[in-house]
Regions:
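Residues lining hydrophobic/aromatic ligand-binding pockets adjacent to catalytic sites
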Residues: 1-137
Length: 137
């Protein structure tokens, strides 16, 4: 089972394995007060993507697509499959620090883990055609 939770919320036993999935440590959170079992920076969006997104909900759909492309590497897939196996045997809580509970990297990871756990395959990427780019500046 996969849950997502903000880093600043209190830890609960029902959280199971608490895994911080942000590249940066949560601002203002003391390490001795953080109850994380693991800090998995390698699965976080790249610095470039994180800065581009800036937690702007208008960029959410594009962020999801770009982040999924970043997750489409052998190393990231291995990490995702490992998380999915753990979630199949117990509860895994993905911990994030963003203020927006609906537009953050943990939401995308939870969707990807649900897809893997359901035995789903990634949809094939469509080839780009001229004028089809949706990148926003």
């Amino acid at each position: 089972m996969v849950h997502i939770k903000r880093a600043y919320e209190p830890a609960r036993s029902a959280d199971g394995q608490r895994i911080l999935i942000d590249r940066l440590w949560p601002r203002g959170l003391r390490k001795d007060k953080a109850h994380f079992d693991e800090w998995l920076k390698a699965i976080a969006p790249s610095d470039q993507l994180r800065k581009w997104f800036g937690h702007d909900p208008r960029r959410w759909e594009e962020f999801r697509q770009r982040y999924r492309r970043e997750l489409d590497t052998p190393a990231a897939q291995e990490l995702l499959e490992g998380l999915a196996r753990r979630a199949g045997h117990g509860t895994v809580t993905l911990i994030y620090s963003a203020h927006d509970e609906f537009h953050n990297d943990a939401v995308v990871l939870a969707e990807e883990l649900a897809r893997i756990m359901a035995g789903g395959k990634r949809p094939a990427r469509r080839a780009s055609t001229p004028g089809s780019s949706r990148a926003r500046a």
